[in-house]
């Protein structure tokens, strides 16, 4: 097996959309039912995708709102972004658009690995954002999209596998686009 690659992934979104729950479900395989606002946590996990081992460093961020100042640390050495909203919250869906805009302003690249995640899909009766709305938003950003339920462990692993694939796809396109020049 080739040497493992390190990847740093930031998880961003409005408060109480399930960023920490999704991350803990992926890393530890358990759902944390209590809400304890995150300041910033970092988790690590080894995962194999397409025969390649990845050492993931997951930056679970504090919830942002439309007025939050986007910390510059969220743009340094990050290989991919998981933007999370709750399918039960119009506010979180609107705020994720603002966060995306701030992210593009900070990073300065139009093509960055982004995974849009509609979380809490298990709360059928409280749903206010349709699957189609989430998918359309992701397509407008040229981003990957999945809905998830951290509580029911639906697609938590898929979310993190997919962001790795998105990062590798963009890294591959960047390295293919590179040209070299030799001065003799």
Swiss-Prot record:
It is an enzyme of class 3 (hydrolase). InterPro entries: P-loop_NTPase, Small_GTP-bd, Small_GTPase, Small_GTPase_Ras-type. Residues 182-184 form a propeptide. It catalyses: GTP + H2O = GDP + phosphate + H(+). The record marks 35 as: Important for autoinhibition of GTPase activity. GTP binds at residues 16, 18-21, 32, 35, 38, 119, 122, 150. Mg(2+) binds at residues 20, 38. It is a lipid-anchor. Its EC number is 3.6.5.-. It is found in: Endomembrane system; Lysosome membrane; Golgi apparatus membrane; Endoplasmic reticulum membrane. It holds the Pfam family Ras. The conserved catalytic Gln-64 found in other Ras-like GTPases seems not to be involved in GTP hydrolysis in RHEB. This is GTP-binding protein Rheb. It comes from Bos taurus. The gene is RHEB.
